[in-house]
Amino acid sequence: MANTKSALKRIRQTATRTARNRAVTSKLKTLRKKVAAAVETSDKEAAAAAYNTFSSAVDKAAKVGTIPANRAANYKSKAAKAIAKIA
């Protein structure tokens, strides 16, 4: 257990950040699955709508630092590529 005030504060901060990051990561996984499901059904409109939501969430996660910027770009690129194949 931590002995100093600053160490106790860091523990509290880490717990808060971990919870927030977990929630954001879970949301991203769900949105990725929605995009994949829309692509699977070959519904281009639904896929585009799901992609817009997913893209926005990924950008926000990267901006805050939950995921690295390159990973965000990779996620968006793969999703866009899958949607482009629907045509």
Swiss-Prot record:
It holds the Pfam family Ribosomal_S20p. One of its GO terms (cellular component) is small ribosomal subunit. GO terms for biological process: translation. It comes from the Bacteria. Keywords: Ribonucleoprotein, Ribosomal protein, RNA-binding, rRNA-binding. The keyword Phosphoprotein does not apply. One of its GO terms (molecular function) is small ribosomal subunit rRNA binding. Residues 13-23 have a biased composition (Low complexity). Residues 1-26 are annotated as: Disordered. Belongs to the bacterial ribosomal protein bS20 family. Binds directly to 16S ribosomal RNA. PANTHER family: 30S RIBOSOMAL PROTEIN S20, SMALL RIBOSOMAL SUBUNIT PROTEIN BS20C. This is Small ribosomal subunit protein bS20. It comes from Akkermansia muciniphila (strain ATCC BAA-835 / DSM 22959 / JCM 33894 / BCRC 81048 / CCUG 64013 / CIP 107961 / Muc).
